[in-house]
Amino acid sequence: MSSQFPSSPYRTVDPYSPPNYKQQPNCPSSNYEKAGKTASESIGNFGKGDYPTPFPSSSIGRVSSPVRSNKVDAIPSSPAFPGQLAETSPKFSSKLSSPSRHTRVINAELDPSKISTITVGRNSSQCDVALCKNKFISRVHASITYLPQTNEVKIHCFSMNGLIVTYRKQFDCYQLKDTMNNNNRAYRLVPRFSNEKCVKEIQDEGGFINFTLEEGDTVYMTYYKGIMLDFRQVLLRISLKEKNSSSEPLRFEKKAEFESESETKHMGSIRKHPLIFTDTSMDRPKKILKDSNKISIGSDSGVAERMLNHFLNSKSSPLSSVSSVDHEEQTLRQDSLSSDKNPMTMKKPKLNKRVLPSKPKKSVKENLDELSRRNIDVMHLQHILTNHLAFANVQQTPLFQLQQVNSQISELSRDELRSILSDAKCVGVIYRHGKDAAGKPLDEEYFYDLENDDDYERRNLVSSLKGGRTGLRSCRRTHKQYFWKKPAK
């Protein structure tokens, strides 16, 4: 590598500086040597003061960008700036622990009138206050209890991730005293100048004081307005509910009761006035629809007579009598109006649909006789079907599979095939109920019965081939339909 691009980050030779005549052997004068020494010393000092160790991504050669010395976050990796590193490190640490970095703050309110407890965590169904979905937050992370007798807050941590309790510095509580409470790790926050021994570390950072709670830890501290719980990326602010909010529903209930009483009094005064009957039949426009006017006039006159008789003969309170009469009048008028709007229509009687007579099913003997008249060897087909059931890989075969044994059997109907199988002594049947996945009824299944087979050669051959699994178990000879059920979590 040439001298113009050195490997060291410090500049040794500048192409724009005056030449060093000390390196030239033909230099006759000593003044030039002194000038070369002073120039090289000034160049070396200038490079050491203004060119720090660059970052790995910087380019080699002459540094063209300005030195970043005023930024707090840029911490150089060279020991050339020890003073600057010592100044920037406290600022950087305070910035990391500041609560302003958290993006979300959740309020948790406690009832000051009684001992109230809320649970905090990730699961909304198990906790009163649900935090965000975060891997550092457990399903039930902590519980917060307010004790109104002593104005204290009890914080208990359930999670192995722990939490950080943050409060303001002006509260003057800097020590945690150990309290033996049922052999659990319980602490109490005490003032700074207390004689108690401090058992847990408390960090003093600027205007806030922090201490951590691990899994199973409990702390008792006096309630202040600025207590916050840090769950990493989420802050929980603890506060008390306002006492005025509980008195507002009572005030609204009293107001509603007063309004209801005034309304009932007003309605009673209205009902005490005498009844005045007016004839309003002339004001209404009349519709001419067959003989509906006669019905409406008769109903109106009957209503008036009934109302007068009921009012004169009743001994009960006028309020109840008037309400019952009004109800009767209303129902009768609705009936008359409905008869006016809906003229009578003749309904056609429902005609019973003609049911086609179904063909009666033939018996087994009739089916076999019909097959013999068609020159079909029933005994041969029985022998083929029995051999298929006896030497099949499965012990039970449905009917639709037996129809596909050969071409001659496939031409038979299902009833004819059932008749052939039912006539064989060594063939058993399992009747099934229900439907398959396509909604079609399930076919019956047939199996080979070794004990009832008269062909001894076939019995010996089947037992020698299949061994002990020749017969069908009795529990499998009845149909059992299984349904899929979603497994429990």
Curated annotation (Swiss-Prot):
Modified residues (Phosphoserine): 40, 100
Pfam families (alphabetical): FHA
Cysteine disulfide partners in this protein: none
Location of the region described as Disordered in the Swiss-Prot/TrEMBL record: 1-101, 316-366
Cellular component GO terms held in the UniProt record: chromatin; cytoplasm; mitochondrion; nucleus; Rpd3L-Expanded complex
GO molecular function, one term: chromatin binding
Chain's role: Binds to the promoters of genes with functions important for the G1/S (start) transition; primarily genes involved in pheromone response, polarized growth and transcription.
Family named by the database record: Belongs to the PLM2/TOS4 family.
Protein name as annotated: Protein TOS4
Organism encoding this protein: Saccharomyces cerevisiae (strain ATCC 204508 / S288c) (Baker's yeast)
